[in-house]
Swiss-Prot record:
The keyword Cytoplasm applies. Keywords: Cytoplasm, Decarboxylase, Lyase, Porphyrin biosynthesis. Gene3D superfamilies: 3.20.20.210. One of its GO terms (biological process) is protoporphyrinogen IX biosynthetic process from glutamate. This is Uroporphyrinogen decarboxylase.
Length: 343
């Protein structure tokens, strides 16, 4: 059975424009909160294939999205490379011993050795595929090497990225070594996700906007493209979505062998279409806070549909759904995307 979502990724004609939401398996769903409470904490949930499978499937069953996205976290990659990851309540993820020099980097596992430790992710994928409806796609994902490296170097989330940027400008050789090592792990990681059964790959560069546009290709995009090239050579039937958040200034310079470009909410959809619409399918890009109002949601969905015309497009939010959004409003978003695009 063909999957509408996969067809849309390849720019094929579909009966309506498919839709999913970043962070769709998340805290706005009471059912998710129940499973997370049973798991004890977020990381336990990521490590438990049965529970991770359950929360992956929840938004498909409850909200009606056209694709499931694997429930996991981008930081399982540095965790299995050998870094000590903790999630601190109210503060987010922390690494106790961030990378300061080459010796710190050399201590970490690389390539297939690190990727082979992520068996709980691959087991989760296999469980999901057993239970996911045949017409629904499963999206696997990874953080981009730059986004992963920011946590590995800073030790936690940051607003300034000054430790990373100090390295970028004063010791770029070391930063490139870190990015290269992470890239090799991610290649094997995504390959193993594909072998386990995912239908689509998304690469999240959540902190793309931390890099000045003239340096973005050198320190992030080229590594994302390297991963895409590696996967495309082996798995041409698996579409790849690139999502660099918050860099409209880079639209003119986008290149690479992938199918879908994720547009965040700060980039006007008509601008993205003008710059990239002929080369790539576009995904996005409703402002997530519009979900607080059904009227605002309808207005945005209709506006995006008018720009895209139901062609070479996947509906999504321009970032993740927020925890206090009413479930009814999320359902309304999905229904409206289907309504306005039905052919």
């Amino acid at each position: 059975m063909s999957k509408i979502f996969v067809d849309a990724c390849f720019g094929k004609e579909t009966p309506y424009t498919p839709v999913w939401m970043m962070r769709q398996a998340g805290r706005y769903l009471p059912e998710y909160m129940r499973v997370r409470a049973e798991a004890g904490n977020f990381l336990n949930l990521c490590h438990d294939p049965k529970k991770a499978c359950e929360v992956t499937l929840q938004p498909v069953d409850i909200v009606g999205v056209d694709a499931a996205i694997l429930f996991s976290d981008i930081l399982v990659v540095p965790l299995e490379m050998g870094m000590d990851l903790k999630f601190v309540t109210g503060e987010g993820p922390k690494f106790d011993d961030p990378i300061k020099n080459e010796a710190d980097l050399d201590r970490l596992f690389g390539g297939d050795e690190a990727a082979s430790k992520l068996t709980y992710v691959y087991d989760t994928i296999k469980l999901i595929k057993e239970q996911l409806a045949e017409d629904k796609a499963l999206i696997g994902f990874t953080g981009a090497p730059w986004t992963l490296a920011t946590y590995m170097i800073e030790g936690e989330g940051t607003k300034t990225y000054n430790i990373c940027k100090k390295m970028m400008y004063s010791n770029p050789k070391l930063l490139h070594k870190i990015l290269s090592k992470v890239t090799e792990v991610v290649k094997f990681y995504m390959e193993k996700q594909i072998e386990a059964g995912i239908d689509v790959v998304q690469i999240f560069d959540s902190w793309a906007a931390a890099i000045e546009p003239s340096k973005y290709d050198e320190f992030s995009w080229k590594y994302m493209v390297e991963i895409a090239d590696y996967l495309k050579a082996k798995y041409p039937h698996i579409p790849i979505i690139m999502f660099p958040k918050g860099i409209p200034a880079f639209l003119d310079k986008v290149y690479g062998n992938f199918e879908v470009f994720g547009v965040d909410w700060s980039t006007p959809m008509d601008l993205a279409k003008e710059k990239l619409g002929e080369r790539y399918v576009l995904q996005g890009n409703m402002e997530p806070c519009r979900l607080y109002s059904k009227e605002e949601t309808t207005e945005s969905v209709e506006s995006i549909q008018k720009i895209m015309g139901g062609k070479r497009h996947i509906f999504n939010l321009g970032h993740g759904i927020l925890p206090d959004v009413p479930v009814e409003n999320a359902k309304h978003f999905i229904k409206e995307c289907h309504r306005v695009s039905k052919k």
